[in-house]
């Protein structure tokens, strides 16, 4: 046939055949080479595909070029097509992407094959004709097209001839099948380029073939490769020396040259302008950038033969070496089988490439959605099949195509998949690095078991770094590693996917592996963000085209996952491994629950085995079990073995879980515990039991707390819950684990890959992603998840029910630390911060079968707030701690000390090794702490007492920096409380509704109800802490403590308890005596070896005995003997005695001795000091030079403490706080009273016997005899020892024999209440006969004791601006040094620490009721005005170690005090003495230091004192016993001047062991020599005489001084006269005031004795009324101090059952001190309430019987302490005029008193006219009537004189205001 066909006819025929394939555009005849025959061959060049005739789903064909194409037509083999250089350019199609029809893919293939069959087989319906000419063929072709068009336009023709197309369809199907069976296609060098706005991908296939055998289509390909051209991404790790960018072109080389294989005139073809799809793709003007970019991609310069990938480097993503695709059928695919040999994937560039692609698709979807919304109704283009496309009308075949859209999948097999996490992928699929981290998958098979049922297996899944280094692998076995199946649900067309991992897996992780994994994971969030945005835009577009699609989208495929156990082994160091074992995991997407039965963390530390620790039994391991179910995969019953011996371990119950989704897998999950590696060297440290994670389809509400701790609900897309977490390990292992983790994470750094040069890119890929906020756009997760990102939404929620931990051997000998945390809620907010809430936290110490609480929660009624609230942000952590009780025990101090010593050794070793460079974070991490209702309990070592610090509110900040750690805190109020014995506590620290207080300070009131005593208050406390390093315990530390107000309210017993408790808060460190003092020298020492005994002897001819005596004189004799002084003769010469130079040398040696570098200053001894001269203010008073300033400067200060208190108030109360103290005093009084009563009975018995014996005697004789006996008894009572007993070394109970026993209780009360008048009687000797018979009956009123704390304080100490500075200058401890030779300068001294105390103002206030003076100690104003910034008290204390080898230390003290003014009342002095001497052996620690602090030197700088002393009683018994100090009570001192000599220094010991006599001997010479004159001048009897005589002296001395100086006699006389007048006038006026005041006092006392008011007449009216009301017997008066009793009494309806007192409730003022009413003993109330209430209130009493309770309850009511004794010198008038006015008022007031007395007596006389009554009333009124006018006169004269005195000397009034109570 080919012989007679012309060449042009052959070409036209072949062109027609090719055009009928619907694949190619117009074919140019010059590029067509035809050779026809039996083996016809057609060769085509640069053949272009027609984009309009190629329809690929979701893509547009932009360009298609085939470089060379050969078609071979044979009669036997059919058609063979061979093509080389197939280049296709695609772009995503948004319109087809909306409504994707799977049938279009099949139809396009059918259309091409049908056209081929039409071209090959010329079917004629009428007859067979020969082929027509070229022109005829063309005309027929055109006519056939028209007919086809007409048929398309006439639908009636289809209906009229329904059967004819069926016949033609069957014939056409056979023709297509025949054509395909003889068609063979082979393609080489296939390049498929997919271009988008911001990314370009390329698929290269080396070779692909298509053939059909027995109806089975087979497609084979080799060398398929996927690469990315744009953007520039990191390809992965490459061998060193190779550049990541192989392009060497400059910026002038445009990237358009990479596609130069395309024709130059391609843009002018009909491809651009004729296609409607191109216009649809360019919906908005924003896409013009894309067209300008792609236009260059599609152009090609002429004569270019380079491959598209040769000019621009591409990054390979994946490579497939070979694969085969087989299927059957044409319009519907059946038995599709895919077999792939090997796939290599490089993961490193995938995230960035995929992110760029998803960003582009999301942007284009958004544009399409906007365009579709504007052009409603939708104009989405659909494919229309017509005859012009070359398809004949075949209705039956068309229906078959449209309905057959499903494909028949058979199997998928992949032999191997290798995914590299870090290596780049080179050519031919080879990885650039051989030992890269790769994930390998072998033998992946997926098969269709039945219709809608897919089953797959994965034989091997592992991850390795090399052939020998496995990172992850499953346990070897015959089973597959992974099995899965997919079951189609016909009802909703969804799949039930089941995934099963039946074999245990093991992960081996190290630093390098984690670096690669973290590097890859760091890129995932941005890709997920882009994917979420794409899904959101796609869902929005779908909902726009089909609004009902949202309801269908709610249904998703169900996924069921079940795994065996997994082990994660983390290699921290070469010797430290941590293994995490996750027991079976299950997941059900239907319920959204991920459940892990248990997670166990174990550790393997080689050093543990070296130390000999036996491997511990793992109490977290699970027991193996055998499976019994063979058809269904279920979770078996598993039981957790718990060690019941552990205090915190919970008994875990059995749990059974069933998964309903695993129904078609034939094999069971084996026992996970039996499959795990059984390495006994691992030790279990952590258990996580019952982990569940809930993934909600829609956000749900979870109950949690807000930032204030109030319960609320949040929306969360997921929630997790952990039932139990247990931690158990030793503290050493814990610290070593922390160190290993710290070192590991310091070395663990995410690899920062080098950024590619994207300057050449014209479109830069931009993406913003915040790892802490993965979704910035709330709508990025779809319409359903967008609602959760509101102000009350969470990203995730976690709840932990219980956490238990046990840290063994926390410190050396400390024991174990156990704790439990309950109800932990974790809120992970959308904004990136996290909130943590802890319901309760309990921590305890376990040591030797005993436990000690460390931290616990205090429950309050109705308080459901969590104990701890924490909020974690990027660089800050905020913690709120409330209702917490912390415990401290004194024995812990030794453990902390040992820990500090170990830290020092470690630091020393590190210093020897050298500094270790570690990368430090330059950013600071801040922890903010807020405290509310915090109780700190202080437990001493040996004492039974306990202290509590109650912190109401506080806040603090901790800042961790790279080189420093700083802590600052502020506490609003701290209340210290104290209890003497813990057994006296009434109940536990637990609040409930029964004993809760309605007041705000419920915790504080609760503590006081339990038995604690409030000791004061600290307000506005600020603490700051700074150190140079946060990683070391011995780094230099600087602590600053500031407090606004410190108030301390104490009694004598509570003060001693407090001081000893503070001392007992640390366990004393006992150092052996030999080690402390080193009494035995290492080498023999001859102290007198080099001593020249004759060096200082002036005459060697002296008597040898004197020389010997001088040599043997001891140091103490020389230093303390004041007789060694040179004798001064009258002519001024000195007698040189033998011991003079010896004495001087000794003193010089003492004063100038040095301790190494420590220099002691030299004394300036000046014997005499003039006290008459005024005080000369020196500017350098406080800037003296002392041994403190001459010490060497220490560059390194390990610790520095600065304490600053603005105001300090120490108030001393009388009475006793502790009940045991009061009971002891009561019992002692009873014992003395019993002895006195027995002696009194014996005396009465003797007296009665004598009376009966002498009954015959006369009355006078009897009286004389009785008087004699009484005298003898009296004399005997004086000579005999009195009945006495001493308590607490300060309370002396004594009663002379024969005295009334009841007087002892009265005296005790008077001593406490300062009633001197009635107590003086005990000082006198009385005989038993003087006691009347009525007095022998002890009334309850006289026997009651009042021993509780007084209502008002008696003495107050006030300090202003107290500053204490403590510097630790040396942290050297010689007890820890074993090698003495390593000590530097062992014989030199060093200063261990230094304390500096400064006080701006110092004041002691006298509040004793019987004292008329206001202050006790204050500043001496006569000394002049104080200098600016001068300190009233300055004290320097230095602790010195004499030599560095000694463990003992000594102290040196320097003190400076400004001039002081003292007003000493004997009552106040006795109170302070009794207060200070109190000592209770209960509060003495059992273990104390061997020696007290040794004060080697005390230096007191000159102090000027002015003293007023007012004695009241004289202890004659003390005088008789040799107490000579009682003689001072005979004299009153007024302005006595005392001055300590300059530079008073004590050298020697001042500890308790030093004899007090020695101390007095040292100071007595100075007092007798220098101070006696000032003391005698201050005697009140001669003070005025001395001052008047000094005025006469000035009258003579001043003129003489003036005349001697300048010769002016008259001026001197005038000055002398003025001084004389002023001095004499003042003293005369003062003397007159004293005489008048003395007279008034005598008269008032006389009146009071005779029944008048006395000095009460001068008291305010309110005080008198209060006293009269309390003394009246009209009704009972009660003061209730117990709130419970008060609340019970309020419920009583009858006032007769309980009479509430006339005062307000004491609880409301329990912190106030100024009460208007008495502090009645609460035990006095006990007798007035019901017995059962009394037993309830006194359940903690120490008495043994009820009688003793009642005896103490009959305590006498205190006198009115608010009644002050007002002096006649108080309230002085300012001027003479005011004095006269006050004189007139006082005289009138006294006259009125006399009138009232007369009128009162007259009215009573008129009522009763009896003579006796008249006489009684007259006698009662006479003293008042007679004495009151005289008292008024004296008072008036006194006021007038005081007015004149103050006007003449205004300073006198200011002195009186400071001295007297007003």
From Swiss-Prot:
It is found in: Prevacuolar compartment; Preautophagosomal structure membrane; Endoplasmic reticulum membrane. CDD domains: GAL4 (cd00067). GO terms for biological process: autophagosome assembly; autophagy of mitochondrion; glycophagy; lipid transport; piecemeal microautophagy of the nucleus; protein transport; reticulophagy. Transmembrane segments: none annotated. Residues 1256-1278 have a biased composition (Polar residues). PROSITE patterns: ZN2_CY6_FUNGAL_1, ZN2_CY6_FUNGAL_2. Its main location: other. It catalyses: a 1,2-diacyl-sn-glycero-3-phosphocholine(in) = a 1,2-diacyl-sn-glycero-3-phosphocholine(out); a 1,2-diacyl-sn-glycero-3-phospho-L-serine(in) = a 1,2-diacyl-sn-glycero-3-phospho-L-serine(out); a 1,2-diacyl-sn-glycero-3-phosphoethanolamine(in) = a 1,2-diacyl-sn-glycero-3-phosphoethanolamine(out). SMART domains: GAL4. The keyword Zinc applies. Residues 1324-1342 have a biased composition (Low complexity). It comes from the Eukaryota. Residues 130-167, 230-266, 298-317, 1251-1278, 1317-1344 are annotated as: Disordered. Residues 243-254 have a biased composition (Acidic residues). GO terms for molecular function: DNA binding; DNA-binding transcription factor activity, RNA polymerase II-specific; phosphatidylinositol-3-phosphate binding; protein-membrane adaptor activity; zinc ion binding. Keywords: Autophagy, DNA-binding, Endoplasmic reticulum, Lipid transport, Membrane, Metal-binding, Protein transport, Transcription, Transcription regulation, Transport, Zinc. SUPFAM superfamilies: Zn2/Cys6 DNA-binding domain (SSF57701). Lipid transfer protein required for autophagosome completion and peroxisome degradation. Tethers the edge of the isolation membrane (IM) to the endoplasmic reticulum (ER) and mediates direct lipid transfer from ER to IM for IM expansion. ATG2 binds to the ER exit site (ERES), which is the membrane source for autophagosome formation, using basic residues in its N-terminal region (NR) and to the expanding edge of the IM through its C-terminal region. The latter binding is assisted by an ATG18-PtdIns3P interaction. Belongs to the ATG2 family. The C-terminus (1237-1862) is required for the location to the perivacuolar compartment. The absence of either ATG1, ATG18, ATG9 or VPS15 also prevents the correct location. This is Autophagy-related protein 2. It comes from Komagataella pastoris. The lineage of its organism: Eukaryota, Fungi, Dikarya, Ascomycota, Saccharomycotina.
């Amino acid at each position: 046939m080919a012989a007679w066909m012309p060449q042009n006819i052959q070409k036209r025929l072949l062109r027609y055949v090719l055009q009928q394939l619907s694949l190619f555009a117009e074919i140019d005849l010059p590029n067509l080479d035809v050779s026809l025959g039996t083996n016809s061959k057609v060769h085509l060049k640069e053949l272009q595909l027609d984009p309009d005739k190629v329809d690929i789903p979701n893509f547009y064909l932009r360009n298609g070029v085939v470089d060379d194409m050969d078609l071979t037509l044979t009669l036997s083999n059919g058609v063979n097509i061979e093509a080389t250089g197939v280049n296709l350019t695609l772009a995503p199609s948004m319109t087809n992407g909306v409504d994707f029809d799977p049938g279009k893919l099949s139809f396009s293939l059918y259309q091409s094959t049908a056209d081929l069959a039409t071209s090959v087989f010329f079917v004629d319906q009428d007859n067979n004709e020969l082929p027509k000419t070229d022109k005829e063929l063309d005309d027929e072709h055109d006519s056939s097209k028209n007919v086809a068009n007409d048929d398309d336009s006439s639908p009636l023709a289809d209906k009229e001839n329904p059967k004819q197309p069926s016949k033609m369809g069957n014939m056409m199907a056979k023709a297509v099948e025949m054509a395909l069976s003889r068609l063979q296609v082979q393609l080489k060098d296939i390049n498929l380029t997919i271009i988008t706005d911001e990314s370009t991908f390329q698929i290269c296939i080396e070779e692909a073939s298509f053939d059909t055998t027995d109806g089975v289509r087979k497609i084979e390909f080799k060398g398929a490769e996927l690469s990315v051209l744009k953007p520039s991404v990191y390809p992965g790790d490459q061998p060193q020396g190779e550049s990541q960018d192989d392009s060497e072109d400059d910026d002038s080389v445009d990237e358009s040259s990479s596609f130069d294989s395309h024709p130059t005139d391609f843009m002018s073809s009909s491809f651009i302008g004729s296609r409607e799809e191109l216009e649809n793709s360019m919906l908005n003007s924003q896409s013009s950038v894309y067209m300008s970019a792609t236009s260059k991609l599609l152009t090609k310069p002429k004569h270019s033969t380079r491959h598209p990938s040769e000019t621009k480097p591409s990054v390979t993503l994946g490579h497939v070496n070979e694969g085969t695709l087989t299927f059957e059928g044409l319009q519907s695919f059946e038995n599709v089988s895919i077999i792939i040999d090997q796939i290599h994937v490089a993961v490193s560039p995938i995230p960035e490439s995929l992110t760029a692609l998803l960003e582009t698709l999301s942007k284009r979807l958004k544009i399409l959605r906007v365009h579709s919304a504007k052009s409603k109704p939708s104009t989405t283009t659909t494919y229309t099949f017509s005859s012009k496309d070359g398809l004949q009308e075949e209705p039956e075949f068309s229906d078959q195509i449209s309905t057959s859209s499903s494909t028949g999948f058979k199997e998928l097999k992949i032999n191997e998949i290798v995914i590299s996490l870090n290596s780049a992928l080179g050519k031919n699929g080879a990885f650039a690095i051989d030992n890269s981290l790769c994930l390998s998958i072998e033998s992946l098979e997926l098969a269709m078991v039945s219709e809608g049922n897919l089953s797959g297996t994965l034989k091997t899944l592992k991850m390795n770094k090399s052939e020998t280094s496995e990172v992850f692998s499953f346990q070897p076995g015959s089973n597959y590693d992974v099995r899965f199946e997919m079951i189609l649900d016909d009802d909703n067309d969804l799949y039930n996917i089941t995934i099963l991992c039946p074999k245990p897996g093991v992960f081996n992780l190290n630093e390098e592996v984690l670096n690669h994994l973290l590097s890859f994971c760091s890129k995932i969030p941005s890709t997920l963000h882009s994917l979420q945005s794409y899904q959101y835009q796609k869902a929005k577009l779908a909902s726009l085209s089909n609004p009902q699609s949202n309801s269908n989208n709610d249904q998703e495929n169900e996924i069921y996952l079940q795994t065996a156990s997994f082990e994660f082994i983390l290699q921290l160091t070469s010797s430290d491994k941590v293994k995490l074992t996750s027991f079976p995991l299950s997941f059900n997407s239907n319920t959204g629950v991920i459940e892990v039965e248990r997670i166990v963390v174990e550790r393997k530390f080689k050093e543990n085995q070296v130390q000999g620790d036996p491997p511990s039994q793992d109490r977290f391991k699970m027991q193996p079990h055998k499976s019994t179910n063979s058809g269904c995969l279920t979770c078996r019953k598993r039981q957790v073995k718990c060690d019941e011996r552990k205090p915190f371990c919970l008994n875990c119950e059995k749990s059974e879980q069933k998964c309903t989704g695993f129904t078609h897998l034939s094999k069971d999950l084996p026992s996970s515990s039996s499959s795990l590696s059984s390495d006994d060297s691992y030790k279990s440290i952590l258990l996580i039991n019952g982990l569940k994670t809930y993934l909600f389809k829609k956000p749900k509400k979870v109950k949690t707390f807000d930032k204030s701790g109030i319960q609320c609900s949040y929306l969360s897309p997921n929630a997790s819950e952990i039932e139990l977490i247990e931690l158990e390990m030793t503290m050493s292992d814990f610290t070593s684990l922390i160190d290993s983790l710290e070192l590991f994470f310091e070395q663990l750094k995410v690899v920062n890959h080098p950024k590619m040069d994207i300057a050449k890119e014209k479109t830069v890929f931009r993406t913003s992603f915040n790892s802490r906020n993965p979704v910035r756009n709330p709508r990025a997760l779809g319409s359903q998840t967008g609602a959760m990102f509101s102000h009350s939404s969470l990203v995730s929620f976690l709840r932990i029910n219980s956490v238990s931990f046990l840290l063994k051997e926390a410190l050396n000998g400390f024991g174990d630390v156990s704790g439990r945390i309950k109800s932990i809620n974790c809120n992970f907010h959308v904004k990136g911060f996290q909130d943590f809430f802890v319901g309760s936290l309990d921590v305890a110490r376990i040591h030797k079968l005993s436990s000690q609480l460390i931290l616990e929660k205090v429950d309050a009624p109705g308080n459901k707030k969590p104990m701890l609230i924490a909020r974690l942000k990027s660089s800050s952590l905020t913690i709120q701690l409330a209702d917490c009780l912390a415990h401290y025990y004194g024995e812990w101090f030794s453990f902390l000390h040992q820990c500090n010593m170990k830290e020092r050794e470690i630091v020393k070793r590190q210093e020897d090794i050298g500094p270790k460079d570690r990368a430090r974070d330059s950013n600071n991490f801040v922890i903010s702490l807020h405290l509310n209702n915090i109780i700190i309990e202080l437990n001493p070592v040996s004492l039974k007492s306990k202290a509590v610090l109650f912190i109401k509110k506080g806040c603090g900040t901790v800042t961790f920096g790279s080189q420093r750690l700083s802590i600052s805190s502020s506490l609003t109020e701290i209340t210290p409380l104290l209890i003497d014995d813990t057994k006296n506590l009434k109940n536990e620290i637990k609040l409930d509704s029964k004993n809760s207080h309605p007041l705000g300070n419920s915790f504080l009131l609760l503590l006081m109800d339990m038995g604690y005593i409030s000791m004061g208050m600290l307000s506005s406390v600020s603490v700051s802490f700074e150190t140079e390093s946060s990683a070391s315990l011995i780094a230099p530390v600087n602590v600053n403590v500031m407090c606004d107000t410190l108030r301390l309210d104490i009694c004598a017993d509570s003060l001693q308890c407090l001081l000893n408790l503070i001392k007992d808060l640390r366990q004393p460190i006992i150092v052996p005596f030999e080690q402390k003092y080193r009494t035995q020298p290492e080498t023999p020492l001859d102290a007198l070896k080099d001593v020249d005994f004759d060096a200082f002897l002036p005459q060697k001819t002296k008597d040898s005995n004197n020389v010997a005596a001088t040599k043997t004189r001891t140091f103490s004799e020389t230093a303390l003997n004041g007789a060694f002084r040179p004798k001064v003769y009258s002519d001024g010469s000195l007698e040189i005695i033998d011991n003079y130079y010896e004495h001087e040398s000794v003193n010089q040696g003492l004063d100038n001795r040095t301790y190494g570098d420590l220099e002691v200053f030299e004394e300036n001894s000046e014997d005499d000091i003039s006290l008459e001269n005024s005080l000369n203010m020196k500017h350098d008073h406080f800037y003296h030079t002392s041994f403190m300033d001459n010490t060497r400067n220490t560059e390194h200060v390990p610790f520095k403490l600065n304490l600053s208190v603005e105001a300090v108030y120490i108030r001393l109360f009388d009475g006793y706080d502790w009940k045991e103290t009061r009971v002891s005093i009561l019992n002692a009084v009873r014992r003395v009273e019993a002895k006195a009563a027995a002696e009194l009975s014996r005396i009465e018995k003797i007296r009665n016997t004598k009376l009966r014996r002498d009954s015959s005697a006369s009355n006078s004789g009897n009286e004389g005899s009785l008087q004699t006996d009484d005298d003898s008894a009296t004399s005997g009572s004086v000579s005999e020892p009195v009945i006495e007993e001493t308590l607490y070394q300060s309370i002396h109970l004594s009663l002379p024999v024969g005295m009334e026993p009841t007087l002892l209780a009265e005296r005790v009360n008077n001593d406490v209440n300062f009633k001197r008048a009635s107590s003086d009687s005990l000082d006198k000797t009385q005989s038993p006969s003087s006691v009347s018979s009525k007095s022998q009956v002890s009334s309850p009123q006289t026997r009651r004791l009042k021993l509780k704390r007084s209502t008002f304080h008696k003495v107050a100490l006030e300090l202003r601006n107290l500053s204490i500075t403590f510097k630790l200058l040396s942290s050297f401890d010689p007890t820890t040094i074993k090698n003495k030779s390593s000590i530097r300068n062992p014989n030199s001294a060093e200063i261990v620490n230094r304390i500096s105390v400064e006080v701006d103002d110092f004041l002691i206030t006298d509040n004793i009721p019987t004292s008329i003076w206001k202050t006790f100690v204050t500043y001496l104003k006569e000394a002049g005005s104080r200098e600016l910034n001068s300190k009233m008290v300055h004290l320097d204390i230095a602790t010195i170690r004499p030599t560095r080898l000694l463990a003992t230390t000594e102290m040196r003290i320097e003190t400076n005090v400004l001039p002081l003014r003292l007003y000493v009342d004997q009552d106040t002095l006795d109170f302070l003495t009794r207060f200070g001497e109190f000592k209770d052996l209960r509060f003495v620690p059992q273990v104390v230091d061997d020696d007290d602090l040794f004060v080697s030197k005390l230096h007191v700088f000159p102090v000027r004192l002015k003293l007023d002393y007012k004695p009241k009683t004289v202890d004659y018994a003390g005088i008789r016993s040799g107490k000579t100090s009682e003689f001072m009570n005979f004299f009153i001192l007024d302005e006595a001047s005392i001055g300590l000599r300059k530079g008073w220094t004590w050298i020697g010991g001042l500890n308790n062991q030093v004899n007090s006599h020695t101390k007095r001997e040292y100071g007595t010479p100075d007092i007798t020599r220098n101070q006696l004159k000032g003391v005698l001048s201050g005697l009140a009897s001669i003070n005025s005489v001395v001052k008047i005589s000094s005025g006469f002296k000035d009258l003579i001395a001043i003129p003489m001084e003036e005349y001697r100086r300048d010769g002016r006699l008259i001026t001197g006389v005038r000055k002398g006269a003025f001084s004389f007048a002023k001095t004499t006038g003042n003293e005369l006026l003062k003397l007159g005031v004293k005489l008048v005041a003395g007279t008034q006092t005598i008269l008032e006392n006389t009146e009071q004795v005779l029944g008048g008011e006395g000095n009460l007449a001068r008291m305010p009216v309110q005080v008198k009324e209060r006293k009269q009301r309390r003394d009246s017997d009209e009704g009972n008066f009660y003061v209730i101090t117990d709130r419970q009793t008060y609340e019970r009494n309020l419920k009583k309806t009858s006032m007769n059952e309980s009479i509430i007192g006339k005062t307000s409730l004491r609880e409301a003022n329990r912190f106030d001190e100024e009460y208007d009413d008495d502090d009645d003993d609460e035990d006095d109330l006990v007798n007035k309430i019901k017995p059962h209430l009394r037993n309830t209130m006194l359940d903690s009493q120490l008495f043994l019987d009820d009688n003793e309770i009642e005896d103490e309850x009959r305590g006498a009511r205190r006198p009115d302490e608010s009644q002050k004794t007002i002096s006649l010198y108080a309230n002085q008038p300012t001027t003479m005029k005011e004095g006269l006015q006050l004189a007139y008022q006082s005289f009138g007031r006294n006259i009125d008193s006399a009138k009232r007395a007369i009128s009162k007596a007259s009215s009573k006389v008129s009522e009763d006219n009896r003579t006796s009554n008249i006489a009684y009333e007259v006698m009662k009124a006479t003293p008042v009537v007679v004495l009151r006018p005289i008292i008024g006169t004296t008072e008036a004269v006194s006021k007038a004189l005081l007015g004149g005195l103050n006007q003449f000397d205004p300073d006198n009034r200011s002195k009186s205001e400071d001295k007297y109570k007003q």
